[in-house]
Amino acid sequence: MFTSLHTPILHPRYCHHPTPSCTQFSPLALPPFHRTLSFLAPPPLLPAAPALSAASAAKPDKSGEQKWVHEGLIMESLPNGMFRVRLDNEDLILGYISGKIRKNYVRILPGDRVKVEVTRYDSSKGRIVYRLRSSTPS
């Protein structure tokens, strides 16, 4: 039934008589991590080449985006966290709340002074990133 192609390759440790099938297998020909005594033990980890960390690979470069930071006064409150903001240079823009301000439930009311990031691509909209504290105690 079995031909020469179907003869099993035996390990030299368990082969007690030298046959061509026993002598053709050499454990020293394999890389060192394949020479484990137990087939259940995983091969040892090899040192990996230094790579970029996951945090730096996931986030885009923030310094590449040019933004202007202006201070302004909230003129009008609009729906969905949008505000009319009068900047110090007398421009009137549409400001929306940043995620940190939304997450921390910072209250912004008309008359508050805020810091706004305005992108250079659309200077009519900006992100409100900070609510400035009022100078008068109330």
Curated annotation (Swiss-Prot):
<keyword id="KW-0150">Chloroplast</keyword>
<dbReference type="InterPro" id="IPR003029">
    <property type="entry name" value="S1_domain"/>
</dbReference>
<comment type="subunit">
    <text>Component of the 30S ribosomal translation pre-initiation complex which assembles on the 30S ribosome in the order IF-2 and IF-3, IF-1 and N-formylmethionyl-tRNA(fMet); mRNA recruitment can occur at any time during PIC assembly.</text>
</comment>
<keyword id="KW-0934">Plastid</keyword>
<dbReference type="GO" id="GO:0009507">
    <property type="term" value="C:chloroplast"/>
</dbReference>
<comment type="function">
    <text>One of the essential components for the initiation of protein synthesis. Stabilizes the binding of IF-2 and IF-3 on the 30S subunit to which N-formylmethionyl-tRNA(fMet) subsequently binds. Helps modulate mRNA selection, yielding the 30S pre-initiation complex (PIC). Upon addition of the 50S ribosomal subunit IF-1, IF-2 and IF-3 are released leaving the mature 70S translation initiation complex.</text>
</comment>
<keyword id="KW-0396">Initiation factor</keyword>
<comment type="similarity">
    <text>Belongs to the IF-1 family.</text>
</comment>
<dbReference type="GO" id="GO:0005829">
    <property type="term" value="C:cytosol"/>
</dbReference>
<keyword id="KW-0809">Transit peptide</keyword>
<dbReference type="InterPro" id="IPR004368">
    <property type="entry name" value="TIF_IF1"/>
</dbReference>
<dbReference type="Pfam" id="PF01176">
    <property type="entry name" value="eIF-1a"/>
</dbReference>
<dbReference type="GO" id="GO:0003723">
    <property type="term" value="F:RNA binding"/>
</dbReference>
<feature type="domain" description="S1-like">
    <location>
        <begin position="58"/>
        <end position="133"/>
    </location>
</feature>
<dbReference type="InterPro" id="IPR006196">
    <property type="entry name" value="RNA-binding_domain_S1_IF1"/>
</dbReference>
<keyword id="KW-0648">Protein biosynthesis</keyword>
<dbReference type="GO" id="GO:0043022">
    <property type="term" value="F:ribosome binding"/>
</dbReference>
<feature type="transit peptide" description="Chloroplast">
    <location>
        <begin position="1"/>
        <end position="53"/>
    </location>
</feature>
<protein>
    <recommendedName>
        <fullName>Translation initiation factor IF-1, chloroplastic</fullName>
    </recommendedName>
</protein>
<dbReference type="InterPro" id="IPR012340">
    <property type="entry name" value="NA-bd_OB-fold"/>
</dbReference>
<dbReference type="GO" id="GO:0003743">
    <property type="term" value="F:translation initiation factor activity"/>
</dbReference>
